[in-house]
Amino acid sequence: MNKKITYFLTVLLLGTVLFSEVFAGGAKRNGTAGAQELLIPSSASGLALNGSNISSITGLDAVFYNPAGFGGTQTSTEAMFSNLTYIADISMSYAAVGVNFSELGSLAFSLRTLNFGDIPVTTVDNPYGTGSTYSPSFVTLGLTYANSLTDRIRVGINLKLVSEKIVRTSATGFAFDAGIQYQGLAGLDGLNFGITLKNLGPQMKFDGPDLIRSASEAEAKRGTNFYTIDAASFELPSSLELGLSYAYNLANDYKMVVSSAFQNNNFSNDEYKLGYEFVYDDMLFLRGGYAYMGEAKDNEYQQFFGVTAGVGVKVNIGFEMVVDYAYRAAKFSESNHLIGVKFNF
């Protein structure tokens, strides 16, 4: 068993080094990746810490940030629902359910949808609108598996089916996340380490009847000709993250968790994240976080979001219910608000 664990860790670390080389220079490719909905957070507790807690996050909250943390689920069944008010009147709805099969690991299913509202239809002949509306359909389905290899090591993988549709033009692809968490680093209880690779997958491409166009030449003897616009393929917003956290007791019922993470983005500036969580009696949670983009310091338009904060409350009503709220400041739009509810059975 120890040999298998050593082999797994070696492969993961080598893969991490390889991907870090591949991701180098991500800032030079700002704005060139698609499927940006994969970057929208679904966990209020994680967002409140600005995603800095990839080494310690557990349960269904971990599905988005580090699937290995889902292997730390302590209950037999867990359900989660959240809603985010994003930017430009866009909102995100998320639902997930997970089952713990003990030594066999944990399995979760998730669904994420975006709501764009009704958008007026405009054409070349009617640039101010035709009177009709449309609403894009962006849906992501997820299947997550995680397990604890030992009392210290957790691993997990998250498979995602990504679907984007705008009227009769659509693109479909898949991506996966993989992660690991190591508890008690260097034999120190409370010191945790995490690695996660996110949104790895093949390129996506739009296609559909709405890309078919007609053309005719004034002096052509033939009738109208039809051709299809060949849309360019686009890559997914992949990233590599390394995280470290430390939890320590302040008093009998009080605990403080300090977490940090480095995020190496393939298509944007790298980020340095820091978060603090104050816990009272495993019942009340106060959180705050910040992300810093060093390469974006000379360009205010590259760091869109600012500080984060949030609160969580856990109550027992025959089963555990957790209500979390997160706030994220934004520079050029309204601030984000994410509310999540979890049920543990």
Predicted stretch roles:
Residues 21-345:
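Subset of outer-membrane beta-barrel
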Residues 3-4, 15, 141:
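A general marker of short, structured functional hotspots
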Residues 10-17:
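Bacterial N-terminal signal peptides
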Residues 1-9:
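Bacterial N-terminal signal peptides that target proteins for export
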Residues 2, 19-20:
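Short intrinsically disordered, low-complexity coil segments enriched in acidic
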